[in-house]
Amino acid sequence: KTSFKATDIIIIANPIRTADGLHKKRRIVSITEVRKEWEEDPLRENGFVDLMRYNPKTDQLEMTDNLINGDSDIIKSIASNVKEWAGNWDAVWDNIMLRASIKKTLVETATKIKNPLLLEAEFTIRSNDEFHRISDSVREKYEIIDTKRIYFEWNEWLKKQIKLKNSFA
């Protein structure tokens, strides 16, 4: 009855067969939020809300309408603790998309320069720290969270790190 009450998010990974049927690849197939308002059966009482689902045609995890439309108690709870996000789903969504763009750029860059160290914990931590430093700097300087400016400055930082090469080796 209460086994899911202490759980916020469930991430499910399963092996997925390739089109030829001969191979399997492990994929995250869903990211599901666990709501807290149910009493007896979370399945019958809409206690589970999918935020992302795997699409086998695109071989990608895709956002659901629930996530896009801000129907996430967890994200709203986190946002309520950030002055610029509280009650402003558009600002929250812009920040989610900014972070997604940064992660995508890191993956694409690591692939392009054939350096998987860009995706390892050490560089990811440095990248996140720089993202937060730039975000704070932009907010202080312009009094708004300008996601385009933040991305531009972060991307310039990334280019400098790649030129230094030894910064992630």
Q: Model segments located where?
A:
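Amphipathic alpha-helical transducer elements in NTP-driven molecular machines
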Residues: 1-4, 25
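Conserved P-loop NTPase
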Residues: 8-102
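Terminal-proximal interaction/regulatory segments of ATP-powered molecular machines
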Residues: 87, 91-169
